[in-house]
Amino acid sequence: MALRLITAGESHGPGLTCVVEGLPAGLEIRPEDLNADMSRRQLGHGRGGRMKIERDTAEVTGGLRHGRTLGSPIAIQIANRDYENWRERMSPWPAAERIEEVHLPRPGHADLVGTQKFKQSDVRNILERASARETAARVAGGGLCKAFLRRLGVSVYSHVLQIASVRAPEPERALEPEDFASVDSSPVRCLDEQASRAMVREIDELRRANESLGGVFEVQAFGLVPGLGSHVSWEERLDGRLAMAICSIQAVKGFAVGEAFAIAGRPGSEAHDEIFYTSERGIYRETNRAGGLEGGMTDGCPLIVRGAMKPLSTLTKPLRSIDIATLEPAEALRERTDSCTVPAAGVVGEAMVAVVLAAAFRRKFGGDHIDDVLEAVAAYEQRIEWRR
C-alpha cells in the first residue's frame, strides 16, 4: 500500500493545494489535526511581514466524511490572503495589461537555474513555486499523517539546536515526549532557555545588519516498531527516504541521523549501540547513537534526525547579481522576506518525517481500514515479542 503527498500552488497565487493518497479508511481526523501545526509553522522570532497577513487554515475538499477518512485521496486547500494584493500579477489567466517581468535572480535561490531550465524570461515564474510558502501545504498533509501515526502510538516532535553562531548544549540525557510540551513557548523553539535568549539576540543583531540566518533543527519520533524500511535495496532504506524528505525542505543543505557527524570521528567501540536482553524489558539498548536506524530500518529506539538550514537567499541588502535580460551587473531582487525561519523549518521537518513514517507503516502493514492496520501491527509486535 503506497502513501504519497503532492502539493500545488504558488507563494502569491490564489492558494495552495495538498493531496494525500493512501491513508486507510475509518481514521478519525479533527480540524485541529491540520490547523494546529499550520499555526505553529508561522511561529518563530525572525519571521517577516507575510506572517502578519496570512492566518493559515485548512479546508478539506475531498476524502473525509463526518470526520473520518474514506480511503480515497484527501484534498486540502489553503487560501493565500495576500493574493488580493497580487491578483493582477499572479492571476491564472491572461492579465488585462502588461505585467512587468522580474529579471534579477537571487544568489542561492532557484531563480537563475529555474529560468534556464524551464526557458523563462520572468524570474517570478520560478520563485513563486520555489518559495517556502509551499511548505504550508506540506504541513497540512503532514497533519493527516501525524493523526495516523498517533493511532499507532507514534508521536513526532522537533526543536531548534542552533541559529547562526549560537548552539544549544547537547541534552544530558535522552529526550522524552514530555520534554517537548513547552517547546513552542520559546520564541525560537529551543529547549534550552539560555540558548533561546542568545538566539533571539543573534537574530536581532544580524537583522539590524541586513543579514539572514540559518541553523539546525532536530526531529524526534517516539513509539516506532523495529523493522520499518528495509536493507534489501537502496530505495527502500528508510534513512535515504528521510534524507530526501528533510533535504527537500527549502534552504536545507544538510542531514544527519543520530550522532552521525560526531561518531564519524570515534572508534567503533564508541560508535555503536550495544544490545541487551532481560526477561522484564526484552531486547533493548542503553544508547541511541544510531538515531533509531540500523541497516536502513528502524531499530525500536527513538528516531532522531537533523536538518541544517542555510541563511535565506533573500536579503534586505541584496547581493550582486545580473539582469538576465541585459546580462548587465545588477543587485538581486529585493522581495519581502523573513530573517530566520529555522523554528518554522522544524515544524515542516516534523511533517516530512511524519509523511515518510506513515508511508513506511502503510508499505509494511497495508490494510484498507484503520482497524486492519492496528491488527497487523499488533500481530507483528507479538511475533517479534516487542515491548514498547
Give a label for each model feature:
Residues 1-388:
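Generic N-terminal targeting/processing segments that precede catalytic cores or assembly contacts
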